[in-house]
Amino acid sequence: MTNIRKTHPLMEIINNAFIDLPAPSNISSWWNFGSLLGICLILQILTGLFLAMHYTSDTTTAFSSVTHICRDVNYGWIIRYMHANGASMFFICLFLHVGRGLYYGSYTFLETWNVGVILLFATMATAFMGYVLPWGQMSFWGATVITNLLSAIPYIGTNLVEWIWGGFSVDKATLTRFFAFHFILPFIITALAMVHLLFLHETGSNNPTGISSDTDKIPFHPYYTIKDILGALLLILALMLLVLFAPDLLGDPDNYTPANPLNTPPHIKPEWYFLFAYAILRSIPNELGGVLALVLSILILVLMPLLHTSKQRSMMFRPISQCMFWILVADLLTLTWIGGQPVEHPYIIIGQLASIMYFLLILVLMPAAGTIENNLLKW
């Protein structure tokens, strides 16, 4: 008798994706982040669902409803903080996952990579709208500032912003629609993640060497299931340490003040995971230029396959490219720091230099390093 997992139409899909899947024998812990992102997504949907049961998307009661969740709902505080800090864990995993893709040349799987970039944009949109929902000061002013950026688009900008707001300012209509979108987007992300996985399984996984591993495959289960479980336990440990010991570490104190359109906070800034892009936006004096740079800072990932000049796929054996990669990482950390600083003397110029360096590294220095390494191979 054939095993049910190989004959049942649904079980067969699960079997081919998570059990009998041929996987390279040498993939490192950097390949754990896909499954960790899946766990983060499930966790966010579940905690979000329970929060939505008690949340009200009305400007007069939104802030109070979040307070009510934390004070009166059974274990509401832990659900709320797991959701808020779960978003941070989600983005940590996302950045590491993308970084892994850049380092090991995984972007040569074009379809998988492009769906991944769409996933990144969708996740960023979801997180932004989620940050507006508690209706604190930073929620309100963050929503006002970021949506207002669209007014920089020539001709249609102002109409577009008012259409998104549902009025002439960020108000009840904005909050209600943001809640609706924040609820639906994670399910769209789940569907996109399945497409991402579908395209990945067409080619099979990359590996640290960047060389085809078709001659040396092992079954996904038990080898990588146990490895993923270890990763998941470490992720949950890190999340719960954050939730139980420092739940407000990554948040903004201003968000504990109810939204007030008449009082602007001294420093408007987004959550930490958007600071690098925010720093790039602020470093350009022209509004439209800043918005374009902001979008391009993420959209540039789509160009990565075109900018690959090396004869080798992975950076494992390319020391010059490795240097460029780690300079890029340091540059992104610098941008993240600058994004959280006020707009004054030393920070402005540091932000501008870091922004120039970001685009210079990706568009010029990394492709140049690949070409130099190709020539070194001839020696």
UniProtKB/Swiss-Prot annotation:
Keywords: Electron transport, Heme, Iron, Membrane, Metal-binding, Mitochondrion, Mitochondrion inner membrane, Respiratory chain, Transmembrane, Transmembrane helix, Transport, Ubiquinone. The chain crosses the membrane at residues 33-53, 77-98, 113-133, 178-198, 226-246, 288-308, 320-340, 347-367. One of its GO terms (biological process) is mitochondrial electron transport, ubiquinol to cytochrome c. Binds 2 heme b groups non-covalently. It is found in: Mitochondrion inner membrane. Its cofactor is heme b. It comes from the Eukaryota. One of its GO terms (molecular function) is metal ion binding. Heme b b566 binds at residues 97, 196. The keyword Transferase does not apply. CDD domains: cytochrome_b_C (cd00290), Cytochrome_b_N (cd00284). Pfam families: Cytochrom_B_C (PF00032), Cytochrome_B (PF00033). One of its GO terms (cellular component) is respiratory chain complex III. Heme b b562 binds at residues 83, 182. A ubiquinone binds at residue 201. InterPro entries: Cyt_b/b6_C (IPR005798), Cyt_b/b6_C_sf (IPR036150), Cyt_b/b6_N (IPR005797), Cytb/b6-like_sf (IPR027387), Cytochrome_b (IPR030689), Cytochrome_b_C_euk/bac (IPR048260), Cytochrome_b_N_euk/bac (IPR048259), Di-haem_cyt_TM (IPR016174). It is a multi-pass membrane protein. Belongs to the cytochrome b family. Heme 1 (or BL or b562) is low-potential and absorbs at about 562 nm, and heme 2 (or BH or b566) is high-potential and absorbs at about 566 nm. PANTHER family: CYTOCHROME B. Component of the ubiquinol-cytochrome c reductase complex (complex III or cytochrome b-c1 complex) that is part of the mitochondrial respiratory chain. The b-c1 complex mediates electron transfer from ubiquinol to cytochrome c. Contributes to the generation of a proton gradient across the mitochondrial membrane that is then used for ATP synthesis. The cytochrome bc1 complex contains 11 subunits: 3 respiratory subunits (MT-CYB, CYC1 and UQCRFS1), 2 core proteins (UQCRC1 and UQCRC2) and 6 low-molecular weight proteins (UQCRH/QCR6, UQCRB/QCR7, UQCRQ/QCR8, UQCR10/QCR9, UQCR11/QCR10 and a cleavage product of UQCRFS1). This cytochrome bc1 complex then forms a dimer. This is Cytochrome b. It comes from Connochaetes gnou. The lineage of its organism: Eukaryota, Metazoa, Chordata, Craniata, Vertebrata.
